[in-house]
Regions:
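A short alpha-helical cap/connector motif
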Residues: 1-91, 98-143
């Protein structure tokens, strides 16, 4: 248990998942690098909540990001309609996945769906990749 905050992706065998965890999720030097390259622009959310800072880092690395609340996928027809319109380069960030039992079911249904490939459960949000060139994997991350 003492080692959990220091693992930072070790134990993840997929190179894609490991790279995502190390370079996006657990990146601590991102603010310094961003400030050096964008000295005159102060759009990095320094005082924003942790989830917003994570979303900023994801959007910087992956251009096609969709952020949805789990409540927007509660209806089965909305859920299926969304999955029919995804592309391989899309990254989905689902917020509030553990807020309610129904939202948890939506997340588990999304993880089990054949359209999703890589899923990361970060406790307060979930991240889904749809790239069909990768193998289907699910990761629970202590973030």
């Amino acid at each position: 248990m003492l080692r959990m905050p220091r693992t930072r992706g070790f134990g993840v065998q997929s190179p894609t998942a490991y790279s995502f965890l190390r370079k996006v999720v657990n990146e601590k030097g991102f603010l310094r690098i961003y400030c050096q390259t964008h000295a005159g622009i102060s759009s990095y959310p320094q005082d924003a909540p942790r989830q917003k800072r994570l979303l900023f880092r994801i959007r910087t690395v992956y251009p096609n990001v969709v952020e949805l609340s789990a409540s927007s996928l509660l209806k089965r027809e909305d859920f299926q309609q969304f999955l029919w319109n995804v592309s391989d380069d899309m990254v989905l960030v689902v917020t509030d996945i553990n807020l309610d039992a129904e939202y948890k079911k939506v997340w588990l249904r999304l993880v089990a769906d054949n359209c999703t490939v890589l899923t990361f459960d970060l406790v307060d949000c979930g991240i889904v990749f749809f790239d069909k060139t990768k193998f289907k994997q699910n990761f629970n991350v202590n973030y």
